[in-house]
Design a protein with these regions (language model features):
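FMN-binding flavodoxin-like domain, especially the glycine-rich phosphate-binding loop
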Residues: 1-8, 12-20, 25-39, 43-167
């Protein structure tokens, strides 16, 4: 399957989830990309079976950000392959990737890949930096390479749900 259209859906108050989601989306190399920024308002998506989607949200306290899930509640897929990405502040992402995968699966998407990337912690300061400057250029290059791996998986017919607990 070669998706013609990708949906890049993210909640990104500090911009870290957006940067990684866009990099993964570039790696998918779809002819058309639709960006759905749920940072300030709820979004509605009606993805089709032949599309692909990237969902990226920050981790708060080991969980997918609750406000992100509320803002993404109206997304719908039709067996649409999805990449789930969580951004964590260099502490732990715990159950966030599983929660996001379950969330999108309940809305008609098939989680075919998952990743956790480090993003600058929201508590980071000049005096007490926590993952300062992340994701950086290397992180975004890795995210784009990850998107290319997913593109190859989809081209080979890989639209089976993965077990995100193994991440």
């Amino acid at each position: 399957m070669k998706p013609a259209k990708s949906w890049i859906c993210y909640f990104s108050p500090t911009g870290t989830s957006r940067r990684v989601a866009e990099a993964v989306g570039r790696g998918l190399n779809c002819a058309q990309t639709i960006v759905c920024d749920a940072t300030h308002d709820a979004v509605s998506v009606a993805a089709e079976r032949g599309d692909a989607a990237v969902f990226a949200v920050p981790v708060y306290g080991g969980h997918a950000a609750p406000l992100a899930l509320r803002r993404l509640d109206a997304v719908r897929g039709d067996g649409t392959p999805a990449v789930v990405v969580v951004l964590y502040g260099n502490r732990a992402y715990e159950h966030a990737a599983c929660e996001l995968a379950d969330f999108v699966a309940a809305r008609g998407f098939v989680p075919v890949a998952a990743a956790a990337f480090v993003g600058e912690h929201s508590y980071s300061t000049a005096r007490w930096p926590i993952a300062a400057g992340r994701p950086d250029g290397d992180d975004c290059a890795e995210a784009e390479a990850f998107g290319r791996v997913v593109e190859a998986k989809l081209a080979a017919g890989g639209v089976r749900a993965i077990d995100v607990k193994r991440l």
